[in-house]
């Protein structure tokens, strides 16, 4: 039975990936990769058919079990008090929202906007979140008017159900998957004057994050699957983290690597590098930028969780494919990968979403430097959290959506209960503060939900002291701009 399920889930995952590749613009088509995926899918389907015939013969009662779609009543029964499930569908001319709460109240409403119109709105908002600038004072103002317009468009039909809600379970569609709903204002807002502390005026904005905790879900069926998992003690225990892999021999020789920076009044803020592969005809691991700041982040989370780094923190050359595949994940409640997420076509021969690990040029014989979606499917996890802290896997690009769906689906199949992913390249100091605060809160309050722990950590960063110049004894800028506090989203339960 396990073999049949494995073949099915691999075929399903590859089929979704093939569908996504077929849906991109003609100039982005990858015919060779599509053909290879088709061959793999057919092979897996043949294997599954063979195994099913064997199961029917030897275990006829198992063959009678079939997956059923989640009905409205089943969806309601999945919910706890204070939870609201909201799903979207974006169409060519009109879109739709559907919501249900634990009491059984249901709302279904059209949205007077097409998929392309909503995509343009999302892209407009993301200009201030992923601006590609190199100075703090060059960060654009966040478009509060457009954000509130989108809030009204998407959520006004279901406001009645949200009035007393504490947790919004969100099933986004298309471009909505790259927009953290936490950044939507719940009332019209005009940005005031920040004064000496730059960005402090954003603290007065009535963000949705101040009212609700939010979890994203791949589907309603995924919620059903996750909530069927056996319960376990709330306290976090063991941890394993992989970070700052080395993608070339040159990186291995360098004591330090220059990273992208935002400079403010002479004080640099580091942003994590992202791969610059657009227009590159032939790409290898060596083109990927190193992520040196992620090593300290992995170590800090180990300290917060009171885990000995020896045997739990694998950085640089140790962050390799062989190490990942050989690790025993039994009891590892938090699994962290601080590296790049890649999609088909990013590198030569890459046919599946993958995580980039240390190159075989650095550690010969330790794998090909890629943890593919299919290899993730084969991991045996029982993790409350899988953290993808530097992947930018929820990016606005079609490729980013493909990465988060492919990698996310694989980790859920492998046994993860929730993912923590970023929606744009994070500012490294704020990201490290947010990440460690999140796990500090979960350790201090074991019953605290994942989404609520993230929400509280966001607010603490937003309302906190910000970047303090120790010599001057004052805050130069706060982390209240959503670029700093809103990149991470919880996907799962």
Model-derived regions, located:
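Short, Lys/Glu-rich amphipathic helical modules
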Residues: 18-44
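Short, charge/polar-rich alpha-helical segments
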Residues: 1-15
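Non-catalytic alpha-helical coupling and interface elements of nucleotide-dependent molecular machines
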Residues: 16-19, 23, 46-49, 53-56, ...
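Catalytic cores of enzymes
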Residues: 36, 58-493
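Conserved positions within tetratricopeptide repeat
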Residues: 8, 12, 42, 451-454
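Charged/polar helix/coil "stalk" or linker segments at domain boundaries
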Residues: 2, 20-24, 28, 90, ...
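Amphipathic alpha-helical coiled-coil segments
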Residues: 36-63
């Amino acid at each position: 039975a396990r073999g049949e399920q494995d073949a099915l889930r691999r075929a399903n995952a590859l089929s979704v990936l093939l569908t996504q590749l077929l849906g991109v613009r003609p100039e982005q088509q990858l015919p060779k990769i599509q053909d290879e995926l088709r061959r793999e899918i057919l092979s897996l389907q043949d294997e599954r058919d063979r195994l099913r015939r064997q199961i029917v013969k030897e275990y006829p009662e198992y063959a009678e079990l079939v997956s059923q779609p989640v009905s409205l009543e089943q969806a309601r029964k999945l919910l706890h008090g204070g939870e609201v499930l909201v799903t979207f569908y974006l169409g060519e001319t009109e879109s739709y929202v559907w919501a249900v709460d634990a009491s059984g109240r249901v709302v279904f409403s059209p949205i007077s906007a097409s998929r392309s119109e909503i995509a343009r709105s999302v892209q407009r908002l993301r200009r201030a979140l992923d601006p590609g600038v190199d100075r703090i004072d060059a960060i654009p103002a966040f478009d509060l008017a457009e954000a509130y317009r989108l809030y009204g468009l998407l959520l006004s039909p279901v406001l009645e159900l949200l009035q007393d809600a504490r947790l919004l379970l969100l099933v986004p569609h298309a471009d909505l998957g790259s927009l953290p709903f936490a950044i939507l204002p719940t009332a019209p807002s005009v940005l005031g004057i920040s004064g000496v502390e730059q960005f402090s005026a954003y603290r007065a904005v009535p963000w949705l994050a101040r009212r609700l905790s939010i979890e994203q879900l791949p589907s309603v069926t995924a919620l059903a699957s996750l909530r069927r998992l056996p319960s376990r003690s709330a306290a976090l225990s063991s941890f394993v983290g992989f970070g700052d892999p080395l993608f070339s021999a040159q990186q291995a020789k360098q004591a330090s690597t220059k990273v992208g920076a935002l400079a403010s009044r002479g004080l640099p803020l580091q942003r994590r590098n992202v791969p610059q592969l657009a227009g590159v005809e032939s790409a290898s691991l060596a083109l990927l930028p190193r992520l040196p700041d992620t090593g300290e982040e992995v170590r800090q989370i180990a300290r917060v969780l009171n885990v000995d780094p020896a045997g739990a923190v694998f950085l640089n050359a140790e962050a390799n494919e062989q190490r990942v595949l050989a690790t025993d994940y039994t009891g590892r409640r938090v699994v962290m990968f601080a590296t790049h997420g890649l999609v088909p076509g990013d590198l030569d021969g890459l046919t599946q979403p993958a995580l980039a690990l240390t190159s075989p040029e650095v550690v010969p014989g330790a794998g090909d430097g890629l943890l593919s979606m299919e290899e993730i499917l084969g991991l045996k996890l029982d993790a409350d959290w899988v953290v993808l802290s530097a992947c930018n896997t929820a990016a606005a690009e079609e490729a980013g959506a493909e990465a988060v769906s492919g990698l996310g689906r694989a980790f859920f199949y492998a046994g993860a209960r929730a993912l923590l992913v970023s929606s744009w390249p994070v500012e490294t100091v704020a990201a490290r503060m947010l990440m460690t605060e999140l796990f500090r809160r979960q350790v201090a309050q074991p019953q605290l939900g994942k989404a609520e722990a993230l929400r509280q950590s966001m607010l603490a960063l937003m309302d906190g002291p910000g970047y303090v110049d120790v010599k001057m004894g004052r805050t130069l800028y706060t982390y209240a701009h959503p670029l700093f506090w809103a990149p991470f989203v919880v996907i799962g339960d």
